[in-house]
């Protein structure tokens, strides 16, 4: 008889039963013990002896087991890993207690994209937007020092979000910690808030461009109107200025009028000191002519300045039928000229009747356009020689004296170049 070693720890007990003669076995019989894993806490009970002998060659014995307690809860299936949950970093605690329904499959939850009205969007709570708002707070600080507690209250975010930003800025040496909750900006203040300043400058530049375009349009209109005025045949006959017209603007008793006829691109420089007033003229295009406008005489007046009352007074100014001679001078009792009256804005009807009585030849082919200003004064002197008792006094020396520019000493002025007596003239008061 042999005992199989499959019994393990029950083999000594079986040998004791066989030695006591409790079991009647033949010599060729085999005993096989089938048992499960041992339970430490369960008591071991001896097997009941058989009631009678059996003729089977193999005897089977079962190891008694203690009753197991019922499981408290079903265990989850081991074939699928546990579900990973996304953390809500905006709350004070990490996990929220709440019941969740059974998760079936990998389909999208129907209520996942629906947000409550008071819930912030993902962009509003992003670190990118929080960093921009934090830099705006730094730009408002005069010395660049910001309290982190105050910044968290203003931005309405958690302090750990502010700490994340300050740790990065401190790592790239843009800020430095002054104390536990105070930091100071180390970078350039011009870079903080540069986006808004750039936007404001762009708007200012656009407004300046619009203003420039408007001014260019107005200048173009004025240039066009002036060109049309100069090309009009009706206005060409009145395109001149006399000495009396200039005197009507300035007070002859207080001011001295000097007329300057210069070519284009003439440079004028005026030096105003406490005692003297100096004017410097320089031109590379041609000579510069300077004239002195004398005081207006009592019997001389410009035909364009004839008073309307004098025209409508009813006096007979019909000339003789003989050859045209020099017209008589206007009476000395003519009314004074109005300084506020425009020089060139005269009515044509008020001038032409006056010109008809003078019997002065006024052919249009003899008139020069406005642009030909060199010969305009000569035409005026020839046509109105009887009405101009005093002409412009030329202050320019003869053109053959080319060295007059270098013939003045430091104490000499423009009056030293001419043989005119300027003692009776009153200096200009500016």
UniProtKB/Swiss-Prot annotation:
Residues 187-375 are annotated as: Required for interaction with TRIM28. The modification Phosphothreonine is found at residue 426. Residues 402-419 are annotated as: RB1 binding. Phosphorylated by CDK2 and cyclin A-CDK2 in the S-phase. Phosphorylation by CHEK2 stabilizes E2F1 upon DNA damage and regulates its effect on transcription and apoptosis. Phosphorylation at Ser-396 by GSK3B promotes interaction with USP11, leading to its deubiquitination and stabilization. BIRC2/c-IAP1 stimulates its transcriptional activity. Residues 105-189 bind DNA. The modification Phosphoserine is found at residues 368, 396. The modification N6-acetyllysine is found at residues 112, 115, 120. The modification N6-methyllysine is found at residue 180. Residues 324-333 have a biased composition (Pro residues). Residues 361-430 are annotated as: Transactivation. It comes from the Eukaryota. It is found in: Nucleus. One of its GO terms (biological process) is DNA-templated transcription. The keyword Cell inner membrane does not apply. Residues 62-103 are annotated as: Cyclin A:CDK2 binding. Residues 95-123, 294-340 are annotated as: Disordered. Residues 148-169 are annotated as: Leucine-zipper. Residues 84-186 are annotated as: Interaction with BIRC2/c-IAP1. Residues 190-279 are annotated as: Dimerization. One of its GO terms (molecular function) is RNA polymerase II cis-regulatory region sequence-specific DNA binding. GO terms for cellular component: centrosome; chromatin; cytoplasm; nuclear chromosome; nucleoplasm; nucleus; Rb-E2F complex; RNA polymerase II transcription regulator complex. Belongs to the E2F/DP family. Transcription activator that binds DNA cooperatively with DP proteins through the E2 recognition site, 5'-TTTC[CG]CGC-3' found in the promoter region of a number of genes whose products are involved in cell cycle regulation or in DNA replication. The DRTF1/E2F complex functions in the control of cell-cycle progression from G1 to S phase. E2F1 binds preferentially RB1 in a cell-cycle dependent manner. It can mediate both cell proliferation and TP53/p53-dependent apoptosis. Blocks adipocyte differentiation by binding to specific promoters repressing CEBPA binding to its target gene promoters. This is Transcription factor E2F1. It comes from Mus musculus (Mouse). The lineage of its organism: Eukaryota, Metazoa, Chordata, Craniata, Vertebrata. The gene is E2f1.
């Amino acid at each position: 008889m042999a005992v199989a070693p499959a019994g393990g720890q029950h083999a000594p007990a079986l040998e004791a039963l066989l030695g006591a003669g409790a079991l009647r076995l033949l010599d060729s019989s085999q005993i096989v013990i089938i048992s499960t894993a041992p339970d430490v806490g369960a008591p071991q009970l001896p097997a009941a002896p058989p009631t009678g002998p059996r003729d089977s060659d193999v005897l089977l014995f079962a190891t008694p087991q203690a009753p197991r307690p019922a499981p408290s809860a079903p265990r989850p299936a081991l074939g699928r890993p546990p579900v990973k949950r996304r953390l809500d970093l905006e709350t004070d605690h990490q996990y929220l207690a709440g019941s969740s329904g059974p998760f079936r499959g990998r389909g999208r939850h129907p209520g996942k994209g629906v947000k409550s009205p008071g819930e912030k969007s993902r962009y509003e709570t992003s670190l990118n937007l929080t960093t921009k708002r934090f830099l705006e707070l730094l730009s408002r600080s005069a010395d660049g020092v910001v309290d982190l507690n105050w910044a968290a209250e203003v931005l309405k975010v958690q302090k750990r979000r502010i700490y994340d930003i300050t740790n990065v800025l401190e790592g790239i040496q843009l800020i430095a910690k002054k104390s536990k909750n105070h930091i100071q900006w180390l970078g350039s203040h011009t870079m903080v808030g540069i986006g808004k300043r750039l936007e404001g400058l762009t708007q200012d530049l656009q407004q300046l461009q619009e203003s420039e375009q408007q001014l260019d349009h107005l200048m173009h209109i004025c240039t066009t109107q002036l060109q049309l005025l100069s090309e009009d045949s009706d206005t060409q006959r009145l395109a001149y200025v006399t000495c009396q017209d200039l005197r009507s603007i300035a007070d002859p008793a207080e001011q001295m009028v000097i007329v300057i006829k210069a070519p284009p691109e003439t440079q004028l420089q005026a030096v105003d000191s406490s005692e003297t007033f100096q004017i410097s003229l320089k031109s590379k295009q041609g000579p510069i002519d300077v004239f002195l406008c004398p005081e207006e005489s009592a019997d001389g007046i410009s035909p364009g300045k004839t008073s309307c009352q004098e025209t409508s007074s009813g006096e007979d100014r019909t000339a003789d039928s003989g050859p045209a001679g020099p017209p008589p001078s206007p009476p000395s009792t003519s009314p004074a000229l109005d300084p506020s009256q425009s020089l060139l804005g005269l009515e044509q009807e008020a001038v032409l009747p006056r010109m008809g009585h003078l019997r002065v030849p006024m052919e249009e082919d003899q008139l020069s356009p406005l642009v030909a200003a060199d010969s305009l004064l000569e035409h005026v002197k020839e046509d109105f020689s009887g009405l101009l008792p005093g002409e412009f006094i030329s202050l320019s020396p003869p053109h053959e004296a080319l060295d007059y520019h270098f013939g003045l000493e430091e104490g000499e002025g423009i009056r030293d170049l001419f043989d005119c007596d300027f003692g009776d003239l009153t200096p200009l008061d500016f």
